[in-house]
Amino acid sequence: MSTIDVPAGFASSPFQRLLRLVTSQQKLWTVLKSAVQIFAIRILGAGLTYASMILLARWLGAHDFGIYAYVLVIVTLLGIAFSFGFNSSGVRFVASYLARNRLRRLSGFLRFSHKVVAALALLGALAGAGLVFALKDIIEPYYVAPMLVGLLCVPVWALLNQMEATARAFGLVNVAYVPGYILRPLLMIVFVGGLVTFGGTADAVTGLWALVGACTVAALGQGLVIWRRIRKPRSAARPAVHARHWFAVSLGFQIGRAHV
């Protein structure tokens, strides 16, 4: 590939570094391949999600599907909130530590971030369940059980977000996006469709139990693949932990996302 002339004013600038990246054939091919994979997964995932919503609306009925959709929005928002920005900062920290071969910090961040996200999301879900019980006389009765079941999904949802970021940072495109965009809606169709096919009754609660099951299966599969693929950096001796710095940067990402 021919060299691109860079204006003198851009010497040693980010613009020049970007051009060097783009003009590297191997790196360009890798970037294009990843972009095509992500685009294809997102398109297929959007189609599966749309199909799953149509089928759920038919199987659950208008009233129960409305409850399911309402709780799903809450689960999604809480799953993002209880990630505390680690799903955004994870891409930065992991890529940086890999590039500079700081395996102790990399191992420390991988362990710390996933444990913190899981613990905080679990505490948040428990607090949410307590709030639902405290307000059960105010909340419409048909919302109580679906919200409690939906809250079970929050820690798993937050972990899925975190593991997606980890896989992206390691360049594992399929591992990052397939579980959340393809496997989860596909399992929803299989679980609820199987229940209806074999004579079961589908409602908002069973739909949310199916969501919990789909997210759990997706998270287990994703976690197993990631942990096997990153065995070397994960097993580095004496992980270095910089909790204050990681929290500060992660919360900055979270605040920025909330503002947007």
Question: What do the PLM-derived regions correspond to, one by one?
Answer:
Residues 26-29, 60-62, 79-115, 168-175:
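Transmembrane-helix boundary and interhelical linker motifs in polytopic inner-membrane proteins
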Residues 56-77, 144, 204-209, 242-256:
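Interfacial/gating helices of multi-pass transporter permease domains
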Residues 138-163, 212, 216, 251-253:
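Alpha-helical transmembrane segments of multi-pass membrane proteins
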Residues 148, 178-230:
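Hydrophobic alpha-helical transmembrane segments
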Residues 1-48, 111, 239-256:
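N-terminal membrane topogenesis motif
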Residues 94, 123-141:
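Short membrane-interface helical motifs at transmembrane helix boundaries
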Residues 10, 48-52, 69-98, 117, ...:
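Small-residue-rich midsections of specific transmembrane alpha-helices
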Residues 156-182:
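Membrane-interface junctions at transmembrane-helix termini in multi-pass inner-membrane proteins
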